[in-house]
Amino acid sequence: MARAQALVLALTFQFCAPETETPAAGCTFEEASDPVVPCEFSQAQYDDFQWEQVRIHPGTRTPEDLPHGAYLMVNASQHAPGQRAHIIFQTLSENDTHCVQFSYFLYSRDGHSPGTLGVYVRVNGGPLGSAVWNMTGSHGRQWHQAELAVSTFWPNEYQVLFEALISPDHKGYIGLDDILLFSYPCAKAPHFSRLGDVEVNAGQNASFQCMAAGRAAEAEHFFLQRQSGVLVPAAGVRHISHRRFLATFPLASVGRSEQDLYRCVSQAPRGAGVSNFAELIVKEPPTPIAPPQLLRAGPTYLIIQLNTNSIIGDGPIVRKEIEYRMARGPWAEVHAVNLQTYKLWHLDPDTEYEISVLLTRPGDGGTGRPGPPLISRTKCAEPTRAPKGLAFAEIQARQLTLQWEPLGYNVTRCHTYAVSLCYRYTLGGSHNQTIRECVKMERGASRYTIKNLLPFRNIHVRLILTNPEGRKEGKEVTFQTDEDVPGGIAAESLTFTPLEDMIFLKWEEPQEPNGLITQYEISYQSIESSDPAVNVPGPRRTISKLRNETYHVFSNLHPGTTYLFSVRARTSKGFGQAALTEITTNISAPSFDYADMPSPLGESENTITVLLRPAQGRGAPISVYQVVVEEERPRRLRREPGAQDCFSVPLTFETALARGLVHYFGAELAASSLLEAMPFTVGDNQTYRGFWNPPLEPRKAYLIYFQAASHLKGETRLNCIRIARKAACKESKRPLEVSQRSEEMGLILGICAGGLAVLILLLGAIIVIIRKGRDRYAYSYYPKPVNMTKATVNYRQEKTHMMSAVDRSFTDQSTLQEDERLGLSFMDAPGYSPRGDQRSGGVTEASSLLGGSPRRPCGRKGSPYHTGQLHPAVRVADLLQHINQMKTAEGYGFKQEYESFFEGWDATKKKDKLKGGRQEPVSAYDRHHVKLHPMLADPDADYISANYIDGYHRSNHFIATQGPKPEMIYDFWRMVWQEQCASIVMITKLVEVGRVKCSRYWPEDSDMYGDIKITLVKTETLAEYVVRTFALERRGYSARHEVRQFHFTAWPEHGVPYHATGLLAFIRRVKASTPPDAGPIVIHCSAGTGRTGCYIVLDVMLDMAECEGVVDIYNCVKTLCSRRVNMIQTEEQYIFIHDAILEACLCGETTIPVNEFKATYREMIRIDPQSNSSQLREEFQTLNSVTPPLDVEECSIALLPRNRDKNRSMDVLPPDRCLPFLISSDGDPNNYINAALTDSYTRSAAFIVTLHPLQSTTPDFWRLVYDYGCTSIVMLNQLNQSNSAWPCLQYWPEPGRQQYGLMEVEFVSGTANEDLVSRVFRVQNSSRLQEGHLLVRHFQFLRWSAYRDTPDSRKAFLHLLAEVDKWQAESGDGRTVVHCLNGGGRSGTFCACATVLEMIRCHSLVDVFFAAKTLRNYKPNMVETMDQYHFCYDVALEYLEALELR
């Protein structure tokens, strides 16, 4: 049977295998002496039993179940279950593909499994592992063939092991035969491609990809077999083609324990495929052994060194990273690192961090665990800001509870920090000491109570946050403690003046007012009196006074009586402690009980008997009575009884006779002797207490006086009354009358003679003046001019009145002859030191005579201005008197003098060319006519309406011309180029009264006029004039000329300027800016006559006054008119010239360069020991003298009945000419408000000065602000301050919004400090919302105490000026409203200081006088007092010193 089967197998093999293929090795277990292949096998020594090699032939007596043949067999019934035995095939080491075949037999008669036949493949003598193939069960009594496709090649070797494992049934047989090795692929088992090693990092997933070739059976299973024997089933098998398939074996999260050798195994009943062993290499990611090292720490960074020299794990290291987190923090952040040091940025200050190093090797999951951490803390950082939200929680009189926002780490930036609450306040009073304290708060505190404060004090508090790295100070917030009862009034502050029946009592505010004093209470009562008629103690009386009334006059008191006064102050919290003082009234003169002079009781030639009545003592008893006899003289004025007429020195008759006196004491009576009325005979020849009463002379008249005296404590009071008159005897009466009449006639004749003498002197003076005027240069005979003082004279620019006593003026005036003889002038004031003498350097055109500057040398030749015979020059010293005479003279004055210019004129006129003329053409005189150079294109184009005018001792110094018309502009610039003019003076606006007065002959930027290019280089705008600088270039010329145009814009459209202050400053500016070697100054207005003539006359006369001390206005005007017709057009212009020259002479040059200011000012305030005055005081007196008082007609609008209630006081009214009329209409036709528009230095109408709004005028005030675009309001008085019956009330909302008539005012924001409260308001017209709103800042200045002329602090005032200036610049330069109580002194001081500071910034000049004078031209009460004027200088000095420190 076996043989038959073997034959079948052989045939099959021969059919399937190559014909020449023979096994390379194997065992057939046959007995043939020459086997096909060598057979090498062995049995394992550790088996439980041994395989049996059997040979069963036919006929052999064997169990029926066994097949015939030679093979290896195991009888399961002979072994115990679980026992096993192994057959070890020979060691194989093949170079190429090969196949191992074997036959097996598994049979049990009852069908049970005899056991399991397993096949193992051991590689290189390694562990056995698990079976690569096994078969169990009963498969019949036939042989089955299986194949092993082992893909292990040389140099590796392997062994195949067959294992028989006895089943629990242990019945049946297991057979094994024909183990053969063939050098061709297996047909029944797949061959695996080479399996490569797999390297992964620990914890990562590994995957073996097993590629197999062959025909896979349906029951084929694939496994990944570990060398240790563990099998892993395939996750999936993917067929690449019909003979190739891929099995994938994933290994999840492998670790070092999974590192081993693995191979692929396919199992099927027909055989198994086994791959080579591949290694699963598991690398441990690296980890540093030591933590990183800290190199440096900062608030927001840490610099570390990685310290990775020693590691745990496998390399190589391909990446280094830093992992850091807050200590015990939930987050971590990783940064890659390239160097050994690394800086961690953007860390939180004062925070502990854990920092570890991560190392990474190649491959996924190659990053190792973080190394040991470095635990380090960053430094603290400077706090981000100061604590916020500082506010009060509770305010009491002496303590303040504050609270603020709690602080978080994001603010402190450090866990170690401190909050300090610092506060300061001023004690006030005379000490003016500032208390400063800082209190350190407890950790986490957001509330604190400051104790032991003073009531009603501004407490300036700020919070300071500090940590080790810095500090942040919060903004200072001001709180005010509540009021308390006031402290006591200091007893030493009580001052008093006792009179007889009145006491003037004055006191000072308590040193500790502890709030706003609302009233004072004064109680008084009599406690002692030397007058027995006074009941003591008397009733107690009480009066109350307002807070600003710290004095009182107590009347109807008793003389000689001591009163006890108590004075105490009150706040809203009640009364404070009273101050006590005792004041005794003076005793009063006794009083008499005589209704009229009584009739004598009797009279003789030598005596007269009178009735003496006792007097009544007032405050003291009568001490003595006296009878006084006075001889009546003819011319003596009649004595009226009174205390001043009494006789204080007792004179006996003998003493009076010896001294030649007319009165004597006839008797002295003790008070006790006259207790009731009694008769007394004057002249009874008796002696009374040492006084002889001699008989009276019959021929003389006598007046009899009765005198009573009271003496008390060194005081004496007298009262006397005339009680009788004794006439002379009748026979002596006629001679007396004749004598009286003779004396009266003599007096009349004396008065007449004196008047005649004065008249003769006056006529003599006039004759001398006329004779002196006949000389051609009459003014050269005048006394040598002297430095002119600013004499205090009353002067009104436009309305100068005659002095009250003309005769006295004439008497005081010295004639020219007398001045020459005496060598005197009213200017030679003792101790006068003119300002100019203090300056260093030479005299320039800007430093004129005025103010005593040294006169420049004057030549005589070449001057065209000659004094006439009937119109001689007037000395500067006599100019005021001359103007007064000319304005008030009835026969000959300015009117007649002006009209004389037109008498006998031969106005030869040249026919005007069309392009040069105007509607009323003005012809120029040929001799002085300016001729233009002819042009090639038009040789006749040489005419221009312009004339040369001489200056003072300077020929052709001016060119007077008309304002250019469009067709005349090119000729105008031709003339400027031809004459090399450096200055153009323009005294007109382009359009006036709706008519074009002058064409705009200059460009906005640059333009060509013919062949001349004009470029505007610079524009400087001031309040009353504009200076434009032009560059002139002409085609064909290489030269470039610079020309300045001085455009005076303040000349009114009608008449003349109200004041000359601005025009005089303008003339000085032109003089100073024109180079001495330049060509003529071109001057034009509209027609080139009236205004132009005024300018030239003023320029010339200022030079003449400076050089010679005289002015000759009349002849100067006459000479000008000979050069150009109608140079002075109106009498008003002629008078204005005189007034302007007078103002210049009186005021002088008051400008000081800033580099000379300190030294000059020091000299100005020096007190002259002779005059006990200073230059500064004299300058202020000059300012007062030239300040024009307002007439009633000038304030006609303010005086209208409907406007009276809009004025706080009728003494301070704005003139009509500078009123800002209200524009917004609220239905009321009245558009008046008590306010005045005034100039600053650089801007016209820059200020609006007004008074503190009344309750009824508050809507008008806000209309004024809105209508005139006022962006700043400066408040210089305090609320509730009142010098009148009108209180100063708050006129703004705070907070919120409020409607004031048409205007809605909304509070936007506010800030405050100890000097200034600043508020921002939004103002809009509620009836015209489409116009938008106006943003206004309100500056309430706190450092100007009531009843003080000047602010408390110059520094604070400068701060106010700076803040206003800064806001004005930010808000677009709107107007500024300035107000105080009455719109006078304080407001004027502010405007003057602002003007002076502008002057310093623009031109480095200081001129306080000019600033004050300009303001007073609008309102005479501006800069009212000497202290305020002095303060303006101090502010300028403080400002300049502050600039030096920058």
UniProtKB/Swiss-Prot annotation:
Q: Which residues cross the membrane?
A: 750-770
Residue intervals of the MAM domain: 25-188
**Which residues does the record list as Phosphoserine (modified residue)?**
S848, S853, S863
Q: Which UniProt keywords apply?
A: Cell adhesion, Cell junction, Cell membrane, Differentiation, Disulfide bond, Glycoprotein, Hydrolase, Immunoglobulin domain, Membrane, Phosphoprotein, Protein phosphatase, Receptor, Repeat, Signal, Transmembrane, Transmembrane helix
Q: What is its EC number?
A: 3.1.3.48
Extracellular-facing ranges: 19-749
- Annotated spans, Disordered: 830-867
Q: Please provide, in alphabetical order, the Gene Ontology terms of the cellular component aspect for this entry.
A: cell-cell junction; plasma membrane
Where, in this chain's numbering, is substrate bound?
E1053, C1085, S1086, A1087, G1088, T1089, G1090, R1091, Q1129
Question: A Gene Ontology MF term for this entry?
Answer: beta-catenin binding
What is the annotated role of this protein in its UniProt record?
Tyrosine-protein phosphatase which dephosphorylates CTNNB1. Regulates CTNNB1 function both in cell adhesion and signaling. May function in cell proliferation and migration and play a role in the maintenance of epithelial integrity. May play a role in megakaryocytopoiesis.
The protein, known as: Receptor-type tyrosine-protein phosphatase U
Native source species: Mus musculus
Instruction: List the top taxonomic levels of the source.
Output: Eukaryota, Metazoa, Chordata, Craniata, Vertebrata
